[in-house]
Swiss-Prot record:
Organism name: Agathobacter rectalis (strain ATCC 33656 / DSM 3377 / JCM 17463 / KCTC 5835 / VPI 0990) (Eubacterium rectale)
Transmembrane segments: none
Keywords tagged on the record: Cytoplasm, Hydrolase, Nucleotide metabolism
Protein name, UniProt field: dTTP/UTP pyrophosphatase
EC class: hydrolase
Similarity field: Belongs to the Maf family. YhdE subfamily.
Catalytic reaction(s) noted: dTTP + H2O = dTMP + diphosphate + H(+); UTP + H2O = UMP + diphosphate + H(+)
GO cellular component, one term: cytoplasm
Length: 205
């Protein structure tokens, strides 16, 4: 069985991976996100790849520098990134409260899409690497929000670390009219698809 490394500081992704019984360590990527793509699906795969590759590179460097201390083993690094998309606009995490208000007003009473990209970087015992990348899309419909509801939600602080300025699994759940697709994908990690992709690649978690 491979040692699994989650290249994300998101507590929601950590919880989702724990739910499927995976044993892993958390090692968040710290590099600056560089976006060269425009389509939401391509953006999330690009960013998830950057995160996974950064952490995998660090693992390889450490193993080379401490070869006498490291027991060779297969390693799987998982990187993920989530964005909200509405009318060709990509919404990441809000920069400030005003940005969160702008996003929530935009999404109020509408249907938008949530994209999560996932990248696996495999490192075998000999230090050879391989990659596999995919994305999942879920459509989410919101009820119409009043300005008071938006202000109250923003004052809770909950939107500030979430793509699109809301968390479907928290207090904002009362404003969700419906979803089409994987609920966990909106939370931050499509674990069912992740598991199926690993199975196709012959990886046991």
């Amino acid at each position: 069985m491979s040692q699994i490394i989650l290249a994300s500081a998101s507590p929601r992704r950590k919880e989702l991976l724990e739910q499927i019984g995976a044993e892993f360590v958390v090692c968040p990527a710290k590099g600056e996100e560089i976006i060269t793509e425009e389509e939401p699906s391509a953006v999330v795969m690009e960013l998830s790849r950057q995160k996974a590759e950064e952490v995998a590179s660090g693992v390889l460097t450490y193993n080379e520098q401490h070869a006498e201390l490291v027991t060779p083993q297969d390693i799987l690094v998982i990187g993920a990134d989530t964005v909200v998309a509405y009318e060709n606009q990509i919404l990441g995490k809000p920069k400030d409260e005003e940005d969160a208000r702008r996003m929530l007003s935009m999404l109020s009473g509408k249907t938008h899409s949530v994209y999560t990209g996932v990248t696996f970087v495999f490192i075998d015992k000999a230090g050879r690497t391989g990659e596999h990348c995919f994305y999942e899309k879920t459509d989410v419909s919101m009820y119409k929000l009043t300005e008071e509801e938006i202000d109250r939600y923003i004052s809770s602080g909950d939107p500030m670390d979430k793509a699109g300025s809301y968390g479907i699994q928290g207090r904002f759940a009362i404003h969700i009219k419906g979803i089409h697709g994987d609920y966990n994908n909106v939370v931050g990690l499509p674990v069912a698809r992740l598991y199926q992709e690993l199975r196709k690649l012959g990886v046991d978690v």
